[in-house]
Amino acid sequence: MAAITFHLDVVSAEKKLFSGLVETFQVTGSEGELGIFHGHTPLLTAIKPGMVRIVKLHGHEEYIYVSGGIVEVQPGTATVLADTAIRGEDLDAAKAEEAKRRAEERILNQHGDMDFAQAASELAKAIAQLRVIELTKKRR
């Protein structure tokens, strides 16, 4: 029996990172984790920094880091419009670790709510990148 699939596009302002048939994908929405399968109810929601986990035909997986954006689901198709999107294999672990260290340092030395909010946002992005790197390495 053939797997039930639908079309997914993952795009950023710079380029299209993925376009093809998928069995499912997961993304971090504004209200939590979303798992999207064929036949999902139409949806338009914000996404948080994190990963898009794509399950292609035959269970092959791909991971893409997104810094935020929106996801739109329509019958037979879905689109992730990301502010920034980077394939897992293109992420730099050393840069992500350094960004995490700097954000943690800023949180400890913050001066006001805006400093804290900005540092917390940077920390979330760095942690998300490190998670995508880890999952991409495990996949190989």
From Swiss-Prot:
Major subcellular site: membrane
Recorded GO CC terms: plasma membrane; proton-transporting ATP synthase complex
GO MF annotation terms: ATP binding; proton-transporting ATP synthase activity, rotational mechanism
Keywords: ATP synthesis, Cell inner membrane, Cell membrane, CF(1), Hydrogen ion transport, Ion transport, Membrane, Transport
Pfam assignment, any one: ATP-synt_DE
Membrane topology, from the record: Peripheral membrane protein
Entry coiled-coil feature ranges: none
GO biological process assignments: proton motive force-driven ATP synthesis
Keyword Membrane annotated: yes
Keyword Translocase recorded: no
NCBIfam families to which the protein is assigned, alphabetical: ATP_synt_epsi, PRK00571.1-4
Family: Belongs to the ATPase epsilon chain family.
SUBUNIT field: F-type ATPases have 2 components, CF(1) - the catalytic core - and CF(0) - the membrane proton channel. CF(1) has five subunits: alpha(3), beta(3), gamma(1), delta(1), epsilon(1). CF(0) has three main subunits: a, b and c.
Function: Produces ATP from ADP in the presence of a proton gradient across the membrane.
Protein name (record): ATP synthase epsilon chain
Organism whose genome encodes this protein: Vibrio cholerae serotype O1 (strain ATCC 39315 / El Tor Inaba N16961)
